[in-house]
Amino acid sequence: ANIDFVPFAQWDDLPSLEGVLDLSGCTFSPNSTLDLRLVAATRLTELRGGDFGGSLRIDASSLTPQPEAMPFGITGFKNLDTLRIAGFTHISELSLPTESCDDLTIENCGSQAPFTLSLPNLVEVRGTLLCRNCGKTGEANSGSLPRLKSVGRQLSFYVGASSFTALEFPLLETVGNGEPVSDDPADDYALYTMPSGCAGEFILPSLQRVNGSMLVSTWNTSTDRAVAFRFPSLQSVAGEISVGHTAYKNRSVATLDFSALTAAGAIRIGNLSSVTDFSTFTQVLPRLSEQTWSVTDCGYNPTYQQMLDGETGAESK
């Protein structure tokens, strides 16, 4: 017999559950939310989603002791409204099966060990994809989203004091829908990344459009490893492109690649002391102005007029 769930189902503790919790035989109301809050060790070994298409939230912030691996497997849950995983501070790996969802949040996970995040099947996030405060400081954390093609509202990969030595979004093509993501202009970025800890180059090889503003932040000076930020297919950014930081100086990044860019609302680059060549922005110059072009505290700081005159820094190489 089917089990009828009310729109919101919550378990504050799971010690009474064991083995496999299979939702495939359950009937859920539209827009149902399944909220699992772990406060003690569970004997649950697997959570099967079946055709569940509501919201799944798993919170281990109060779980004691913290497990070093996910205490149960997660299967199914291919298409969801919202998916949120939080508070698994000691796990070293998190892999999720979801293919599409409205919003996806992963936060405060893997802060006590080198952390690997994998979303091997994820193709689309229709709203916001947020990864915040994950990974252990000073360790080789990594994130892989090999099939992700689009994020509808905002992609925010905010790692805080930690860093990711590898961030892979090889098929990502579009981010943003043109709607503001924050009332504060300082946080209104459709694409927000902190990739300066990446080994070698940070590259989004397939990204073509950002329907909003984008920030490539070098806030974390203690983990600067990336030597290049590359967006070789990026053609248009509806808002502002900001690269660097207003206060913290980065010395590792020497190359910027925006070679396909033909449209942008503004370009602001700061505190990249090893960057001296800005010829990559030549194609987009006609769409800019003196007010929408700013380079400060870099290895070379060309004005808009200098760029128009061909003094891009490439000639000094």
Predicted regions and their residues:
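Concave beta-strand-loop units of leucine-rich repeat
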Residues: 1-13, 18-43, 48-121, 126-144, ...
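Substrate-binding/specificity loop regions of serine endopeptidase catalytic domains
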Residues: 148
